[in-house]
Amino acid sequence: MKITSLHFLIFHKNLNYVSSKVKAKKIFYQRALNNIYLCTIRTMIVDIAEIKKRDNHALDTQESQELVNKIKEIKNSDEQNNSNNNNNNSSSSNFCSNNNSPFSHKETKLMVKEEVPNSIVKNILNNNSCATSIINNKFYTQINNIIPVKPEAMKEENINVSTVNTENDISKEKKENSHYFCDEIKVMKKEYSKDDFVTDVKLEMNDKEEEEEEKQKIGQESTHINIKVEKDTFNECNNSNVNEKKRNRSVDIHNELSNKRILTEDVVVKCNIKNDVKIIVTWNMNSITVRYKNKKKWDEFMNFFNNLNADVLCFQEVRLPAMNLSEPCDNKNKNKNKNDGIRDRGKIKNSDQKSLADYEIMEQILNDDFKDYNAYFSLANIKYSGQLVLVKKNIHIESIRYNLFFENNAHIHHDEGRVILVEFSNFFLLSTYTPNNGFDHVKFERRRLFDEQLQKFVTILRNEKQKPLVWTGDLNIAPEDIDLSHPAEFRRMKKGNVPKEFIGQPGCTDFERKNFQKILTAGNLVDSYRYLQNIKLNEDKKNNIKHTPNINDNIYTWRCPFLLGKSCNKAMRIDHFIVSKEFLNRINKIHIQGFSVFHNNFYGSDHCPVILYLKNE
């Protein structure tokens, strides 16, 4: 017995308008009934309710190609219409529709299995990136750069798919009164590249006996379907790609269709890509746009970056303003850009001439220099603080969080963009730009609150999550005197009358060191660089090898930017990789890139990159 057709149409949805769903339905659903297409998109819609629309035949090769071409036509037409209707500068408009753009909210979207009231579903349809936060924080990541390809040169691959029975058409009255459900769709692969693509789908029903057994296993009326999926291989692949082992893929589709349908316009595809993170870089850039404008220094950095081939880059102090979502309350207020108006901290501001210049610089950086990476921003209101995390597109991310709380509010950013938590398959990566302790009581209190929140956060992470933590970034702490170039001078610095625990250069006071040790204890964490250095020193002692620390050695991550004056030549190690103790066996080495009082390999910043190399699991 044959099931005549089953189709999940996945298509581009530009964030500039909402009508594309309705428009695309009318065009595609008449014939696209027995195919799965994964298009070159970032935001996708999967409408499971359309399963009920059936045809009596599968599309042949020619019809399949016609459908792909039609999808491309509509996508290009929609993008052109949006560009014409947009009031912004043409360059920024085009960039917003770019699939690689972080400005179209390239954050992990969430999908739920609980009942979702109709009012929230409407919010999701109309508000795109923000509305999903209303529901809860079950995270499912986006799938990027999956390309529709020609149906020639196909290779067959068997895939088992389980689904539940399809009901008759849902009446209009039921639709209006019912709740909607978001169920899970998984695309699981050991490796992933844009060469992989799912096309023609053929369905066959099992015998009745097997069907009854399947019903008992699942505990509900269901149909087990075997799907034969054809996979394209590009003729233009490199020889190395041609000789690669076949990638294993399994697709698990399990949606209850009785009074249920997927209506979210966020990604509901979870892509498990078995690529381990091997190299992580952290760097306080001290303004990414300023670094870029110094062509010589930027070229030096890009040469270092290209040779390194890092999997993850954590940039602190990028100094980009967050995008305005509303006008300030008081237009006469001179400080309105600092305090007023609602912001989207995951996007860059481009509403005035000054911010547009930085916006266009970032467009060029991300589309040219970091085109193989997904970008995750967390920004302050003004050109201050802020972070950017770049993750290779072939690395699977399970979730993203932008604060130090574990309520259902992962989308809410720290108001200065100081926290980004990325969950990978086998560990958490926390990047922070920890507040500087400063020299006054206001900043002392700000640092105390941040450290307290961080201590609670790592405690919960240790007790409730079953993954180790890698905490990196500009932590603004030199844990020991050995991390200071001039310990005596650093430790006696102060401004005004302050308690003894606050005496010292920010980053090395007793107050900060005490709180830092509390965080390490609470999270069962270790300063991995110092741990490895101590092992090396002990081995050298056994071999009678003596080391005399030198100001020019690559043992400090921050150096005073002034080459003259009383502060010149001073340096500290305040950028770190702090890891869970059980993660120490994964560390191969840690390298501090910068050296010398002349700031070699600092690439124009007052901080240098620090690189963590991980072993294979």
Swiss-Prot record:
Q: Which cofactor does it need?
A: Mg(2+); Mn(2+)
Q: Where in the cell is it found?
A: Mitochondrion
- Compositionally biased spans, kind Basic and acidic residues: 329-349
**Taxonomic source organism:** Plasmodium falciparum (isolate 3D7)
Major site of localization recorded for this protein? mitochondrion
Name the UniProt record assigns to this protein: DNA-(apurinic or apyrimidinic site) endonuclease
Q: Indicate which residues the UniProt annotation says bind Mg(2+).
A: 284, 317, 474, 476, 606-607
Q: Which reaction does it catalyse?
A: Exonucleolytic cleavage in the 3'- to 5'-direction to yield nucleoside 5'-phosphates
Q: Belongs to which family?
A: Belongs to the DNA repair enzymes AP/ExoA family.
Gene of origin? APE1
Q: Which InterPro entries does UniProt cross-reference here?
A: AP_endonuc_1 (IPR004808), Endo/exonu/phosph_ase_sf (IPR036691), Endo/exonuclease/phosphatase (IPR005135)
| Gene Ontology BP terms | base-excision repair; DNA repair; nucleotide-excision repair
- Catalytic residues (UniProt): 607
Q: Does the keyword Hydrolase apply?
A: yes
UniProt PTM comment: May be proteolytically cleaved into a 64 kDa form.
Q: What does this protein do?
A: Multifunctional protein that plays a central role in mitochondrial DNA base excision repair (BER) pathway induced by oxidative stress. Has apurinic/apyrimidinic (AP) endonuclease activity towards double-stranded DNA (dsDNA). Has nucleotide incision repair (NIR) activity; acts on dsDNA with oxidized bases thymine glycol and 5,6-dihydro-2'-deoxyuridine. Has 3'-5' exonuclease; can use dsDNA templates with 3'-OH termini including blunt-end, gapped and mismatched 3'-recessed.
How is the co-factor bound, per the entry? Probably binds two magnesium or manganese ions per subunit.
Description of how activity is regulated: Apurinic/apyrimidinic (AP) endonuclease activity is maximal at low Mg(2+) (0.5-2 mM) with no activity seen at high concentrations (more than 10 mM). 3'-5' exonuclease activity is maximal in the range of 0.5-2 mM Mg(2+) with activity seen up to 10 mM Mg(2+).
Q: Name one GO molecular function term.
A: DNA-(apurinic or apyrimidinic site) endonuclease activity
Q: Which GO terms describe its cellular component?
A: mitochondrion; nucleus
* Top-level division of the source organism's lineage: Eukaryota
Q: Does the keyword Repeat apply?
A: no
The segment annotated Disordered runs over 74-99, 326-349
Comp. bias intervals (Low complexity): 81-99
Give the record's keywords alphabetically: DNA damage, DNA repair, Endonuclease, Exonuclease, Hydrolase, Magnesium, Manganese, Metal-binding, Mitochondrion, Nuclease, Transit peptide
How is the activity of this protein governed by pH, according to its UniProt record? Answer: Optimum pH is 6-8.5 for apurinic/apyrimidinic (AP) endonuclease activity. Optimum pH is 8-8.5 for 3'-5' exonuclease activity. Optimum pH is 8-8.5 for nucleotide incision repair (NIR) cleavage activity.
Q: State the EC number(s).
A: 3.1.11.2
